[in-house]
Amino acid sequence: MAGSRLETVGSIFSRTRDLVRAGVLKEKPLWFDVYDAFPPLREPVFQRPRVRYGKAKAPIQDIWYHEDRIRAKFYSVYGSGQRAFDLFNPNFKSTCQRFVEKYTELQKLGETDEEKLFVETGKALLAEGVILRRVGEARTQHGGSHVSRKSEHLSVRPQTALEENETQKEVPQDQHLEAPADQSKGLLPP
């Protein structure tokens, strides 16, 4: 059972030598006599790597490009956006990539202030039709105001809240009665 032995036990030379002696290998490999005549100074035996505790310090420093700072600021201000990356299209450019290209283009024109350049880049992309939404804007537009719903309920008196709920209940009931008639008309074949 020569194949049942682990490769980590002994060197390739000692394993091959034992297989030749046992008669499993009929012919010696070409390298066997050369290895036997000129053995290496240190026999190549597998040794398990030592287990290291703790975090090893990486000797390689991180590589940061000028664009990376622009991208980091873009994602912190505007987020990742709603549009997914189209990986099937080789000519696809993400909103962030367009922003970085426009930023560097405006920077080459002579603008040096980073904050002003960042704002001008956003305006330039808006002029091209790219809509950028800040991270906090989507939440405030959804609610209709800058006040959160929890603080809204705390400032409203209970009686006015009940009156609003009653008016909201009345309106949907009237709309609900009209909706089935419209739907039934649309479902019937002409």
UniProtKB/Swiss-Prot annotation:
Keyword Acyltransferase among record annotations: no
GO cellular component: mitochondrial inner membrane; mitochondrial small ribosomal subunit; mitochondrion; nuclear membrane
Pfam families recorded: MRP-S23
Matches recorded under InterPro entries: Ribosomal_mS23_dom, Ribosomal_mS23_met
GO biological process: mitochondrial translation
Region (Disordered) location: 139-190
Composition-biased stretches (Basic and acidic residues): 166-179
Residues carrying N-acetylalanine: A2
Disulfide linkage: none
CDD domains in alphabetical order: At1g26750
GO molecular function: RNA binding; structural constituent of ribosome
UniProt-annotated location(s): Mitochondrion
Keyword terms: Acetylation, Disease variant, Mitochondrion, Primary mitochondrial disease, Ribonucleoprotein, Ribosomal protein
First-listed, main subcellular location of the protein, grouped into a coarse class: mitochondrion
Residue numbers bearing the N6-acetyllysine modification: K102
Record's disease association: Combined oxidative phosphorylation deficiency 46: An autosomal recessive disorder characterized by childhood-onset mitochondrial respiratory chain complex deficiencies, particularly complexes I and IV, and hepatic disease.
Protein family membership: Belongs to the mitochondrion-specific ribosomal protein mS23 family.
Assembly: Component of the mitochondrial small ribosomal subunit (mt-SSU). Mature mammalian 55S mitochondrial ribosomes consist of a small (28S) and a large (39S) subunit. The 28S small subunit contains a 12S ribosomal RNA (12S mt-rRNA) and 30 different proteins. The 39S large subunit contains a 16S rRNA (16S mt-rRNA), a copy of mitochondrial valine transfer RNA (mt-tRNA(Val)), which plays an integral structural role, and 52 different proteins.
Full protein name: Small ribosomal subunit protein mS23
Organism: Homo sapiens (Human)
Lineage of the organism: Eukaryota, Metazoa, Chordata, Craniata, Vertebrata
Name of the gene: MRPS23
